[in-house]
Regions:
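Signature for the C-terminal beta-barrel architecture of outer-membrane proteins
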Residues: 2-184
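C-terminal amphipathic "assembly/sorting" segment characterized by alternating charged
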Residues: 186-188
């Protein structure tokens, strides 16, 4: 089985800065990912990106190219998230997945291992899923997720009334249910 490519465009609704009951329909969300299976589909790696912006439509986010690079080189002000995920299914009925997502990072202090100065905005999630063939349970899942401060939050300075750069739809978070600066251990 070969690689999988996914492309999606959606149109969430922007919430007002000063009035949380005020909304506007001029926001766009683009998402794409590529998943590459390895070791006869027992291991896969995926790279994904999403961009959220508003008051215009940017066709650059329809290209199957690195959007983080497009955004930085072109000077666009969109909020671009990039991530990489790994999944392994080496044993039957048992899978392990890990996901790293970056919202923003200052690379110079990060490379110098000065974590407090790197302004890391991102999330990490890892988990184990067991799906027994003969059991009362469909699956058993254990996972851990952490979201650093200010992740998903972004301010669009070009519009003083609506925030077109945050990952919300009608004021509700489109990412994980966890708010920035939080973590969670889950057992299902």
């Amino acid at each position: 089985k070969g690689f999988e490519y996914t492309q999606m465009v959606g149109f969430p609704v922007a919430q007002g800065y000063n009035n949380s009951d005020e909304f506007k329909w001029c926001k766009a969300l683009s998402f794409h990912s590529i998943k590459i299976p390895l070791m006869q589909n027992k291991f896969s790696v995926s790279y994904y990106e999403s961009a959220v912006y508003g008051n215009y439509f940017n066709p650059a986010y329809l290209l199957p190219a690195p959007w983080a690079l497009i955004s930085r080189v072109s000077g666009f002000s969109e909020n671009v998230l990039s991530g990489i995920s790994f999944q392994t299914n080496i044993l039957p009925c048992f899978s392990i997945s890990t996901d790293f997502m970056m919202n923003d990072i200052d690379l110079k202090p990060f490379i110098k291992l000065k974590w407090n100065d790197a302004a890391i905005r991102g999330a990490f999630k890892t988990g184990i899923i067991y799906t027994p063939k003969y059991s009362l349970f469909r699956y058993i899942k254990l996972d851990y997720c952490i979201v650093t401060p200010y992740t998903y939050t972004s301010c669009d300075s070009s519009d003083k009334k609506y925030n077109f750069s945050d990952y919300t739809n009608y004021g509700l978070c489109m990412g994980t249910e966890l708010l920035p600066n939080s973590h969670q251990l889950g057992i299902v």
